Curated annotation (Swiss-Prot):
Compartments reported by the entry: Nucleus
GO annotation, biological process: cell differentiation; nervous system development; regulation of transcription by RNA polymerase II; regulation of transcription elongation by RNA polymerase II
Task of the protein: Probable transcriptional regulator that is required in neural development for the normal formation of sublateral cholinergic motor neuron processes. Plays a role in regulating the expression of acetylcholine transporter protein unc-17 in the sublateral processes. In particular, it is required in sublateral motor neurons for a left-right turning behavior that occurs during the lethargus phase of the normal sleep process called 'flipping'. During 'flipping' animals rotate 180 degrees about their longitudinal axis.
A Pfam family it matches: Homeodomain
The organism's place on the tree of life at top rank: Eukaryota
Record gene name: ceh-24
Protein name per UniProt: Homeobox protein ceh-24
This protein's UniProt keywords: Developmental protein, DNA-binding, Homeobox, Neurogenesis, Nucleus, Transcription, Transcription regulation
Main location group: nucleus
Compositionally biased region (Basic and acidic residues): 1-35
An example molecular function term from Gene Ontology annotations: DNA-binding transcription factor activity, RNA polymerase II-specific
Null mutant phenotype: Normal growth, coordination, egg-laying, mating, chemotaxis, pharyngeal pumping and VC neuron synapses as in wild-type animals. Abnormal sleep behavior with mutant larvae displaying a reduced, if not absent, type of turning behavior called 'flipping'. Irregular formation and extension of sublateral motor neuron processes.
Bias kind Acidic residues: ranges: 242-252
Expression sites by tissue: Expressed in the 8 vulval muscles, 8-10 ventral neurons in the head and in the most posterior pharyngeal muscle cell, m8. Expressed in SIA, SIB and SMB sublateral motor neurons, and in muscles of the pharynx and vulva.
């Protein structure tokens, strides 16, 4: 009897193992539950709820203010029927929402279509001008006013001014800044107007030369001459330019140094003449001698 009552050590080890595994399983299930609760309690920062949560709090504050204003104004509650069946009843809205035929719909519409919801105001502030009609209209009006201010106007020259300008143009087609200022003061014009007249007149002369060349070819082939181009009226007008346009014209008239093909550096003026004079002064002997045919016959 004593031998049967003694428990076997193998069974005790199994029980301990089973008990240990059971405890481990319970612990693992508790850990899983805690992890899931942590995941639920810590949502992603980039989720829709986390982004809209501050805006929703503002909406709640605004709704409370609206309710307080409605209670102070003394609007009676006329929401008949089951309470809470329709949240947008006339009893829960301010007095200015009762103008429409359907009070509930008129109250819901401004809340969803750019009404008192601050989310729509924040989104409208971030919209570009092409989407926001108010901002686009303001910018369009501002751009039109700036364009009207920069619109160039034509200045009519007198016959005496045109005569003096043509006489000076025959002497020199290009004027320096002091000469231009002196001529402008003598005929009561601005230096910019004188400069523009000279530019227009140079362009007119070049165009007339091209037309004469083309008309000469056409007259020799067909025997008929094209109608003459009367550009005398162009000299009577000048377009007044702004200071910015004047600076651009001065920069365009400056000589441009083209880079060389060796080191990419620009050639100085009169570089070719200086190089030829230096070569002639040294008089290299190998440059004057021609090729020797005997040198090539050896090969």
């Amino acid at each position: 009897m004593s031998e049967k009552e003694t428990p076997s050590p193998v069974l005790d080890v199994k029980k301990e193992k089973n008990e240990e595994t059971g405890i481990d399983e319970e612990k693992s299930s508790e850990d899983d539950c805690s992890k899931r609760s942590k995941v639920k309690s810590n949502p992603s920062k980039f989720s829709v709820n986390s982004i809209l949560s501050p805006l929703e709090s503002l909406v709640r504050v605004q709704q409370q203010l609206l309710k307080m204003a409605a209670s102070k104004s003394g609007t009676p509650g006329t929401n008949a029927g089951v309470p809470g069946a329709f949240p947008y009843g006339p009893g829960r809205l301010p007095g200015n929402y009762f103008a429409g035929p359907f009070p509930g719909y008129s109250g819901a519409q401004p809340n969803w279509y750019n009404g008192n919801d601050p989310r729509f105001a924040a989104a409208a502030a971030l919209l570009p001008c092409s989407i926001d009609p108010v901002r686009s209209a303001i910018n369009h009006q501002f751009s039109m006013s700036s364009m009207s201010q920069r619109r160039k106007r034509r200045v009519l020259f007198s016959q005496a001014q045109v005569y003096e300008l043509e006489r000076r143009f025959k002497q020199a087609k290009y004027l320096t800044a002091p000469e231009r200022e002196q001529l402008a003061n003598s005929i009561r014009l601005t230096p910019t107007q004188v400069k523009i007249w000279f530019q227009n007149h140079r362009y007119k002369c070049k165009r007339q030369e091209k037309e004469k060349a083309m008309s000469g070819l056409g007259h020799s082939e067909d025997g008929s001459s094209p109608p003459p181009d009367n550009d005398d009226d162009d000299d009577k007008y000048s377009i007044e330019m702004d200071d910015k346009d004047d600076e651009e014209e001065e920069e365009s008239e400056k000589p441009v140094l083209k880079p060389s093909g060796v080191f990419g550096l620009p050639y100085p003026p009169n570089a070719a003449a200086a190089a030829a004079a230096a070569a002639a002064a040294f008089n290299f002997p190998f440059a004057a001698q021609g090729p020797n045919p005997a040198y090539y016959m050896r090969w």
